[in-house]
Amino acid sequence: GSLATASEKTRESLLRQLGDLKIMMPRNYNELGRFYGVSATAGIVEETLWRGYMFWYLGHVMPLWAAAIVTSVIFGFGHIYQGIANVAKIILVGGVFAGLYLLTGSLWLPMLLHAVFDAVQGKAVYGLLSSASSNPSSSASSRIRGS
């Protein structure tokens, strides 16, 4: 009925928004497990680089609030491959991580939240891609397979 049609339209809209990023996203259970590993690595490495090193370095030459803004903007544009529309969102997320680092004095919470944030997004996209590819009549399914 109309609910299934609305659901299919929503799914197709989300798949269009993913664009070229689909190739990087998990499509099956094995890839999902690997994606979780990548998420953990991104949380640790990116937070160490952006909040641990760059923020620390800039904090010596500018006020901490300015260092938080600068590192968040650079962090956001470092994710430009996700599309310009997502850069602003990622800048805000970087600002939250910088704020958590300032509040706690530790990278552990930003690392953990970064990893969880990435993993949750990967799981959501996995659900989207696996449901689209399991529905062979879906036009979204044919686009995922490259048909």
Each model region followed by its residue ranges:
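Transmembrane helix-loop-helix hairpins at the membrane interface
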Residues: 19-147
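Membrane-water interface of transmembrane alpha-helices
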Residues: 1-13
